[in-house]
Amino acid sequence: MPETPQNPMSRRDLLKTTSVATAGLLAGSATVRAKSERKKGTDPFRYCLNMSTIRGQDLSVTGEVDVAGKAGYDAIEPWLGKLNDYKKGGGSLKDLRRRIEDHGLTVESAIGFARWIVDDDKQRAKGIEEAKRDMDLLAQLGAKRIAAPPAGARGTVDPMAAAERYRKLLEIGAEIGVVPQIEMWGGNPSIGRVSTAIYIAIEAGHPDACFLGDVYHTYKGGSDFEGLKMLGPQALQHFHWNDYPADPPLDKIGDGDRVYPGDGIAPITDIVKGFLQVGAVPVLSLELFNKKY
């Protein structure tokens, strides 16, 4: 099927994914085949579309949902900015939820940038309120989780202070029914490595604490993928799925250089095998920012 502006993701059928049967990356109609493999009991993973991947198409929220549904995805990961604009413009969250469910999709996670982690008390209070509003909105869509990145943090935030703040976020999420996932951004001075994110999650001391991982950010932050094998199903519930090329080098690579899984040099097969070794089957969410796509 040719790629067109109306069908922007058809070029690769949206996602190359891993099949347990072959223990490697497969090309072709990956999302459709993945569902078929799951029915046969050979692929335990579910596949999600992070809406950053098609942001360049400038679709409406409903258009994004339709693209994900028609492509054969299991789930979506929308961005709060666009959801809030949809709501402010008179869009019905009830109707949007129905549209999502009619496509057989779930909202496994969402991307927000509330400043919950910052040291400034007033900014952090505003950030917590923003996070609460975001989670309230997501709950109306039946969403399960929300990203909790180190948004707004300037310089290093004490990890123990971050853990206390993350716990507060988790407590609010528990009341609403949406789980905040601690997210690391590779190279970020506050949460720039997998180990830092996991430290914060552990020290938060909350039963819902979990980790939102990312292939690119793990590499960018200088963490080794072997470290993921120390985690388990509780920590690894949702994972941003992408790859990175050999060039640009690590010190120059950016978000826009991410490529489809299997098109770069990341140890994709080993990462998936590592998940399975520890009994984790996180939802794999395709998150790209590559303008070439």
Spans of features found by a protein language model:
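N-terminal secretory signal peptides
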Residues: M1-M9
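Active-site acidic/histidine proton-transfer and metal-coordination neighborhood
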Residues: T18-S29, K35-T42, V65-G69, R99-T106, ...
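Boundary/entry segment of secreted carbohydrate-active catalytic domains
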Residues: K40-L59
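Conserved, mostly hydrophobic/aromatic
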Residues: L49, A68, I76, I100, ...
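Active-site beta-loop-alpha junctions enriched in small/polar residues
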Residues: S52-I54, W79-G81, G112-R115, A151-A153, ...
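Catalytic domains of carbohydrate-active enzymes, especially glycoside hydrolases
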Residues: G63-G81
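Acidic/histidine-rich catalytic cores of soluble enzymes
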Residues: A75-I76, A110, R167-I265, T269-G274
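Glycine-rich, proline-tolerant flexible connector loops at the mouths of alpha/beta enzymes
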Residues: E77-I100, P150-A153
